[in-house]
Amino acid sequence: MVASGRTASKGRGNGATPVRPTAGDATPVDSGQPSDTTYGGLEVSAERTRLRIPRDLSLEAWCRLGGRILAVCDSSVWWIGDWLVFGQNQYGDRYRRAMKETKLDYQTLRNYAWVARKFEPSRRRDSLTFQHHMEVAALSEAEQDHWLDFAVRLNWSRNELRKQIRASLSGEEDDLRCEVQLNLQLDELRLERWREAARGSNLTLTDWILSVVDGAV
């Protein structure tokens, strides 16, 4: 378990994301004081509810700034998850203090902690977002690695990863259905009796047959 505020990637260094300004430590968010850093020789000031960007900031510097902000946002979710897991393991008072400190709701915190538990730091891919990992968190470790490796290699977005997983699961379900398909030879009278019974139960004929068979075993 880590409590240092780092993420790690599989086979790619420590995955740490720098979050302190170029000069000195970051100012605590709740202090109300700005935290300054420099891009393209120009000072950018981050406050709790505002980012002050100089008008003459170059496009290149603006892109670097945005990349850093997005990286910190994604990393901070991992940090919250690791912080919650540490608190759960160390103190047992699960979410009460966390909700008070972060002002996040119970379900959000539980999701962060759940994903952090599912992925030890060494299994996290620093080229993918927290949301990528959340998409596969319910799968087995082998399946998680399988899909995350594909996402890294093919540069899938979170939505594309979700689409591919759903398509795969849908294909598996279709295969299973094909394996259990039955062909029944019925006379018209019997078929009509079954249809009438299905209508009386507000079921399709297939669902009615399944319910009868399930009730007999």
From Swiss-Prot:
Alphabetized UniProt keyword annotations: Antibiotic biosynthesis, Transcription, Transcription regulation
GO aspect biological process, one term: antibiotic biosynthetic process
Coiled coil start-end: none
Ranges where the record places region Disordered: 1-41
Function in brief: Transcription regulator that specifically regulates expression of genes involved in the novobiocin biosynthesis pathway. Probably acts as a positive regulator of transcription. Does not bind DNA.
NCBIfam families: LmbU_fam_TF
Protein name: Transcriptional regulator NovE
Source species: Streptomyces niveus (Streptomyces spheroides)
